[in-house]
Amino acid sequence: PDPVKRVVRHQRLNSGSASVSVAFKSDKMVNIYWGDGTVDTDVYGDCTGKNAISHTYTDNGIYYIIVAGVIEDITDFETNGIVVWNRL
């Protein structure tokens, strides 16, 4: 398994809160586990600003997003979710 870099909490209440985004920079590949069974694999590069990675949930609920990869190489991390764990 990948080392965990960040755990982010997102709550979908309705269609207005359906999307969450994560932005970061990494020269190494990371995987994003969105908490609903969906995974974006081998994401790397400048994923900030307009290149931020986003995900839209179809069902209401609380989701925990895990950004996993080489811990030391993920920088400039931002999200519109709530960061639960900074590093594990």
Regions found by a protein language model. Name each.
Residues 1-88:
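N-terminal capping/linker segments that flank leucine-rich repeat
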